[in-house]
């Protein structure tokens, strides 16, 4: 598969969930209707639906594609011998878990073969929940792929990616994210020698911006900072492998044409990128550490109002100015289930053991919080204003328990001594001080 030129500047459209439109050739988009009897350029009209037809209009996600050959032009899929590592859920385990970063493989591995399933909330046939993966790759994909199981949120930690999609081309690197709609065909090219990162597959309602409430009309992730690609296509009639993920399994078929043959499109079921450095961080200017929900970038609502199917939360560089306050994230037992990763630098609640590329999992009611070293320093700190810099941690927080995979519980990256970071917590209680 030809690789889109690695260094040319890409064009984007700005906004979130807009009714976008783009054409790579004049006349690719029909005027005044979606499905003309005969397209002026001889293209096929194909609707790409990300929601049911009858959802509320403000919830609807769909895009009309105008392509050289319809997606229906393919032979039967066959189950692949090689499947994603870690597909099998492990036994119930209530313990706090933490993993070191996974190494880049020595043998050639592309983005799909480099996926490792760490945890999931439910079987892939459920219309809710999430699955969490890490990836480590050292070669560009020479095939195309789509997931029928959910929307993909890709969080690079190392190495830049060029993602060729049916609707255009987008680039991301560390401190940026990409969201790919369920079912969108794409291919990942490596712009550096290798790449590593995290992936959340959202099986539930599509990701959207959180409500701002009393914050007002601006703040957190601003809509204009989300970028959607412009139409780009290739006209090639040659064999291309197409892989799909269906109910957690990989199946493959052989196309006789490029799947990236969309000459024009319009709609709002689209891929997009976002630069996490543009997040407008909100925090206290008086006392106490606010709830981490103020750091939410994107959310997928759950069945219970206010309880997310998945929240994507970041902990970016920020000023700490709270007075008379224990400033690190406080000790916590949570109804929600927290998977954390570290993109860059250090996390302010963990002095050691949590490195870039690493992960941790604290499920429902697992007690967690700053480690012993961090807590001691915070209690004794001189509370001058200071800025936390060189950091970018994130959290996938879900209302459903994340079951670790068998592989995640057996792999050498799992830290056997994670609980030890809370050993020796000093007894500082002094009833004589009352």
UniProtKB/Swiss-Prot annotation:
Enzyme class, broadest EC rank: oxidoreductase
Cellular-component GO terms for this entry: cytoplasm
Keyword annotations from UniProtKB, A to Z: Dioxygenase, Iron, Metal-binding, Oxidoreductase, Phenylalanine catabolism, Tyrosine catabolism
GO biological process: L-phenylalanine catabolic process; tyrosine catabolic process
Reaction catalyzed: homogentisate + O2 = 4-maleylacetoacetate + H(+)
Molecular-function GO terms, alphabetical: homogentisate 1,2-dioxygenase activity; iron ion binding
Superkingdom field: Bacteria
Pfam families recorded: HgmA_C, HgmA_N
Enzyme Commission numbers on file: 1.13.11.5
InterPro entries for this protein: HgmA_C, HgmA_N, Homogentis_dOase, Homogentis_dOase_bac, RmlC-like_jellyroll, RmlC_Cupin_sf
The name this protein goes by in its record: Homogentisate 1,2-dioxygenase
Species per Swiss-Prot/TrEMBL record: Pseudomonas syringae pv. tomato (strain ATCC BAA-871 / DC3000)
Gene: hmgA
């Amino acid at each position: 598969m030809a690789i889109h030129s690695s260094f040319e500047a890409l064009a984007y459209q700005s906004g979130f969930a807009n009714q976008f439109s783009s054409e790579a050739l004049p006349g690719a988009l029909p005027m005044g209707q979606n499905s003309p009897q005969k397209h002026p350029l001889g293209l096929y009209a194909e609707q790409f639906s990300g929601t049911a037809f009858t959802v509320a209009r403000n919830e609807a996600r769909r895009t009309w594609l105008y392509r050289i050959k319809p997606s229906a032009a393919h032979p039967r899929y066959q189950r692949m011998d090689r499947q994603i590592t870690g597909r099998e859920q492990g036994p119930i385990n209530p313990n706090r878990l933490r993993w070191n970063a996974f190494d880049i493989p020595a043998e050639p591995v592309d983005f799909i073969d480099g996926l490792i399933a760490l945890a999931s909330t439910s079987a892939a046939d459920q219309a809710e929940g999430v699955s969490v993966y890490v990836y480590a790759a050292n070669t560009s994909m020479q095939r195309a792929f789509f997931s029928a199981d959910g929307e993909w949120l890709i969080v690079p930690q190392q190495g830049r990616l060029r993602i060729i999609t049916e609707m255009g081309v987008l680039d991301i690197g560390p401190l940026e994210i990409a969201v790919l709609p369920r079912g969108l065909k794409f291919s990942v090219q490596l712009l550096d020698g290798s790449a590593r990162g995290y992936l959340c597959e959202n099986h539930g309602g599509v990701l959207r911006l959180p409500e701002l409430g009393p914050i007002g009309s601006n703040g957190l992730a601003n809509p204009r900072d989300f970028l959607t690609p412009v139409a780009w296509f290739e006209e090639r009639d040659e064999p291309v492998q197409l892989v799909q993920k269906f109910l957690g399994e990989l199946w493959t078929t052989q196309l006789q044409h490029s799947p990236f043959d969309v000459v024009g499109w319009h709609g709002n079921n689209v891929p997009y990128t976002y630069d996490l450095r543009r997040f407008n961080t909100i925090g206290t200017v008086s006392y106490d550490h606010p709830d981490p929900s103020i750091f939410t970038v994107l959310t997928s609502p759950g069945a219970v109002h206010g309880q997310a199917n998945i929240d994507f939360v970041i902990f970016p560089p920020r000023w700490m100015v709270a007075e008379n306050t224990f400033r690190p994230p406080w000790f916590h037992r949570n109804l929600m289930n927290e998977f954390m990763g570290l993109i860059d630098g250090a996390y302010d609640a963990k002095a050691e053991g949590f490195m870039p590329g690493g992960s941790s999992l604290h499920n429902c009611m697992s007690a967690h919080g700053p480690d012993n070293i961090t807590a001691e320093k915070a209690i004794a700190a001189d509370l001058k204003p200071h800025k936390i810099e060189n950091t970018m941690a994130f959290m996938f927080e879900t209302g459903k328990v994340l079951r670790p995979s068998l592989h995640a519980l057996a792999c050498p990256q799992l830290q056997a001594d994670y609980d030890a970071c809370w050993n020796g917590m000093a007894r500082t209680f002094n009833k004589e001080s009352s």
